[in-house]
């Protein structure tokens, strides 16, 4: 847990390491992505994929999902104990797309999980390499964040659909460890906690007995993770109240929803990492790049540089716009689903448009979609500049809250103001300031009211030329201060359904 004891960088969380110096971190992250690359190459050989087919992002996703499923111990155990019709608990598979006679055809493959685990371990020097698995989970999570909206999930837990910018990592599996916890947004943590409290309200044995003790420990741990994301004393104090509650119920749910709303202006610290599809690492390893020797970082220039020299393809449905498909994947690669569009556009060097204006559906193709009309095109994943990823949330100085906009959780450490509609946010805070958290609530509301939309965050931070790998010459962009930059405005995307 980042909030207690030693502070570890999120690369250390990613690689399960204890405190390491920068060189060791770069080497162990390099070892991790190199292992993913080696695994991918081996899988392409097993499946006899051509070079072109191996660069197809849909094939990459199928292969990633197979290895994640092969190592999902909980689910494997569950499947063995509850055999369902037509599902072999020992096998995993998915659609692989091949080019035949100028057409794309779908082939469903099935593999022994044991065999997949063997190939994965072999690619990772015989180890389980959990860090690499988590890395793939975060890439899938970032792709979901860019592709789907979670309105329904928000409404179900009693939250406001406009809080979508707090929902980073909402589709991450529970087994994603410390690295997964670091990238979860405030809203995601709140939602997990509310679900837990609701179960406790409906099932009186939830907190009781041996199981209940474990549940309680999990509850307190999640509270601590969320507390660690808040940056003001009052928000943290409220989290202590929620955590210490004898019998969590509706009062705690109220407090959590209040805290989630407050995070729209007093933003939490949420980590951002550029996690790329397995095929990208595979391409680099195949071309002879030694990740472990060169070192790698998820938050610096490395992912940008990797994407500059990688050609990845995607299947395109008949009425989809390939440029829009590219934008979706670019945002996923850089974990920029909740970033200000002005900043993303500047870094990418082409205009990044809000999702309501994208003519593209998700990257994955459903099994009932017609392959006859499928085409493929190159994804344009290159960028004009690079910038350092942030985990601070961009509050101007730790104690005093800065401005935030409904729907921005900054990804890049780049100077800008964070415009927001104060009236909209503050309207949600009428009424309830009594009860045991009243002084904290009052304090939080006071801080929110003093926040100014024109305050500049990330003072002096800029983007860098791709030739400037040591980040010596920051280029500080100037943005139109009034312009809103939310990706989710006027949204018509599909809901995320498991």
Swiss-Prot record:
Function: Encapsidates the negative strand viral RNA, protecting it from nucleases. The encapsidated genomic RNA is termed the ribonucleoprotein (RNP) and serves as template for transcription and replication. The RNP needs to be localized in the host nucleus to start an infectious cycle, but is too large to diffuse through the nuclear pore complex. NP comprises at least 2 nuclear localization signals that are responsible for the active RNP import into the nucleus through cellular importin alpha/beta pathway.
Organism: Influenza A virus (strain A/Duck/Czechoslovakia/1956 H4N6)
Subunit structure: Homomultimerizes to form the nucleocapsid. May bind host exportin-1/XPO1. Binds to viral genomic RNA. Protein-RNA contacts are mediated by a combination of electrostatic interactions between positively charged residues and the phosphate backbone and planar interactions between aromatic side chains and bases.
Gene Ontology molecular function: RNA binding; structural molecule activity
The entry's keywords: Capsid protein, Helical capsid protein, Host nucleus, Host-virus interaction, Ribonucleoprotein, RNA-binding, Viral nucleoprotein, Viral penetration into host nucleus, Virion, Virus entry into host cell
Motif, Unconventional nuclear localization signal: chain positions: 1-18
Location relative to the cell: Virion; Host nucleus
Lineage, top ranks: Viruses, Riboviria, Orthornavirae, Negarnaviricota, Polyploviricotina
Gene Ontology BP annotations: symbiont entry into host cell; viral penetration into host nucleus
Family per similarity comment: Belongs to the influenza viruses nucleoprotein family.
GO cellular component terms given for this protein: helical viral capsid; host cell; host cell nucleus; ribonucleoprotein complex; viral nucleocapsid
Post-translational modification, as annotated: Late in virus-infected cells, may be cleaved from a 56-kDa protein to a 53-kDa protein by a cellular caspase. This cleavage might be a marker for the onset of apoptosis in infected cells or have a specific function in virus host interaction.
Protein's UniProt name: Nucleoprotein
HAMAP family: INFV_NCAP
Pfam families xrefs: Flu_NP (PF00506)
Principal cellular location given in the protein's record: virion
């Amino acid at each position: 847990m980042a909030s207690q004891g030693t502070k570890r960088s999120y690369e250390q969380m990613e690689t399960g390491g204890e405190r390491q110096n920068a060189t060791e971190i770069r080497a162990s992250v390099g070892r991790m992505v190199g292992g993913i690359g080696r695994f991918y190459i081996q899988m392409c050989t097993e499946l006899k994929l051509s070079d072109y087919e191996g660069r197809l992002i849909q094939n990459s996703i199928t292969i990633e999902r197979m290895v994640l499923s092969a190592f999902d111990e909980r689910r494997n155990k569950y499947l063995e104990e509850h055999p369902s019709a037509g599902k072999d608990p020992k096998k995993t598979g998915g659609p692989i797309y091949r080019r035949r006679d100028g057409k794309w055809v779908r082939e469903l493959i099935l593999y022994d999980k044991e065999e997949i685990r063997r190939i994965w371990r072999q690619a990772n020097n015989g180890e389980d390499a959990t860090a690499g698995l988590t890395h793939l989970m975060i890439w899938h999570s970032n792709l979901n964040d860019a592709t789907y909206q979670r309105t329904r999930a928000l409404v179900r837990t009693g939250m406001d659909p406009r809080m979508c910018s707090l929902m980073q990592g909402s589709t991450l599996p529970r087994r994603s460890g410390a690295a997964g916890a670091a990238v979860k947004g405030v809203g995601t943590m709140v939602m997990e906690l509310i679900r837990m409290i609701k179960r406790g309200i409906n099932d009186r044995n939830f907190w009781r007995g041996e199981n209940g003790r474990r549940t309680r420990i999990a509850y307190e741990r999640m509270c601590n993770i969320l507390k660690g994301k808040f940056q003001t004393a009052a928000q943290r104090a409220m989290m202590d109240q929620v955590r210490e509650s004898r019998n969590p119920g509706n009062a705690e749910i109220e407090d959590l929803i209040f805290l989630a709303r407050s995070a729209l202006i007093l933003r939490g610290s949420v980590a951002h990492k550029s996690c790329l599809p397995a095929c990208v690492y595979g391409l680099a390893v195949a071309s002879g790049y030694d990740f472990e020797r060169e070192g790698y970082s998820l938050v610096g220039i490395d992912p940008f540089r990797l994407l500059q020299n990688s050609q990845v393809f995607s299947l395109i449905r008949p009425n989809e716009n390939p440029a829009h498909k590219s934008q979706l994947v670019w945002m996923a690669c850089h974990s920029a689903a909740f970033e200000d569009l002005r900043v993303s556009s500047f870094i990418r060097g082409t205009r990044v448009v809000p999702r309501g204006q994208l003519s593209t559906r998700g990257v994955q193709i459903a099994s009932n979609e017609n392959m006859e009309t499928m085409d493929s095109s190159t994804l344009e994943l290159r960028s004009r500049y690079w910038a350092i990823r942030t985990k601070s949330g961009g509050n101007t100085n730790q104690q005093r809250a800065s401005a935030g906009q409904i729907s921005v959780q900054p990804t890049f450490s780049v100077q800008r103001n964070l415009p927001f509609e104060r009236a909209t946010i503050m309207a949600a805070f009428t009424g309830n300031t009594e009860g045991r958290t009243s002084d904290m609530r009052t304090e939080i509301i006071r801080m929110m009211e003093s926040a100014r939309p024109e305050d500049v965050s990330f003072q002096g931070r800029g983007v860098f030329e791709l030739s400037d790998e040591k980040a010596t010459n920051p280029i500080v962009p100037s943005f139109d201060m009034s312009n809103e930059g939310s990706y989710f405005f006027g949204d018509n995307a599909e809901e995320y359904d498991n």
